[in-house]
Amino acid sequence: MMLMRESPDDRHYTVSATGVWKKRGGIDVLRGLDMYVRRGERYGIMGTNGAGKSSLINIILGLTPPDRGTVTVFGKDMRRQGHLARARIGVVPQDDCLEQNMTPYENVMLYGRLCRMTASEARKRADQIFEKFSMMDCANRPVRLLSGGMRRLTMVARALVNDPYVIILDEATVGLDAKSRSALWQQIEASNATGATVLVISHLAEDLERMTDRIACICAGTVRAEWETAALLKALGALKILEIDHSVSPRGKELFCNHGLHVHENDGRLSAVHPSSDFALEAVLKKEAVPTTTRFATLDDIIRFPGFPWTGVGGVNGEK
């Protein structure tokens, strides 16, 4: 089923970006980007390093203005009215921005107070989150003495303390063990169930699969494609990745190209995306004695194979 791309005429957005351009170091890192996130939606953003993800998040937060275009949160233009929206946004940035000489509990309480919560409100909410994340044992130790994973959870707790309407997770699970990652997912799901809109920026397929309803792929500063997550995952199950060692089997590349496949090369290994129902090429590879590894496609492959026409997969909205 083909989906209609979101447009400025549609309503019920929490976050909208229209025609956003941003230049950094003389280079356009955002190039007329359009993105519309519905209220209560869990929206994933994926893309290679340098695709423009961090620049977009900084503009959404009102930390830097766009050169052209408009970004609104709750209908407020973040260039002019960002202060009216920021108090209801919880963000987990990539970089550690905690007060290192304060304890996790003090960091979370401070943020709650900055968001105009009363001390009792902030304390009650902090207790709930620290208990959920099993952090009570380290709640009163200086942040500088904690592991990277515990510091990361402290940043998540800080972002959630004021029950934000928008939660932005920028590689939030980096450094977390499986138990902590699961606790984070559960907490985000609980916040989303009460109406919070969630933006997930991650290079981990597991995060995007678990925490999103829709996924956008940002490439060269624009939203190249969007998918409903469930439809995309189902469609990926109908694709497979064929991999060969080019140094061992130079003939394999010729066979890939003869079948019109988009080929990705990395450290001498060639990979190509292929329909899982088509066994003709594999039969040829076997006949030619080309050692081939076969696996199902994953979300990671959308980044690995930018030349593949992913816009035809999973009811995608369409390529810009």
Swiss-Prot record:
Membrane-topology descriptor: Peripheral membrane protein
Assigned keywords, A-Z: ATP-binding, Cell inner membrane, Cell membrane, Membrane, Nodulation, Nucleotide-binding, Translocase, Transport
Domain ABC transporter span(s) in chain numbering: 15-245
InterPro entries: AAA+_ATPase, ABC_transporter-like_ATP-bd, ABC_transporter_ATP-binding, P-loop_NTPase
E.C. code: 7.6.2.-
Main subcellular location of this protein, as a coarse class: membrane
Location of the protein in the cell: Cell inner membrane
Signal peptide span: none
Domain of life: Bacteria
EC class: translocase
Classification via PANTHER family: ABC TRANSPORTER ATP-BINDING PROTEIN (PTHR42711), ABC TRANSPORTER ATP-BINDING PROTEIN NATA (PTHR42711:SF5)
Function summary: Part of the ABC transporter complex NodIJ involved in the export of the nodulation factors (Nod factors), the bacterial signal molecules that induce symbiosis and subsequent nodulation induction. Nod factors are LCO (lipo-chitin oligosaccharide), a modified beta-1,4-linked N-acetylglucosamine oligosaccharide. This subunit is responsible for energy coupling to the transport system.
Subunit: The complex is composed of two ATP-binding proteins (NodI) and two transmembrane proteins (NodJ).
Protein name according to UniProt: Nod factor export ATP-binding protein I
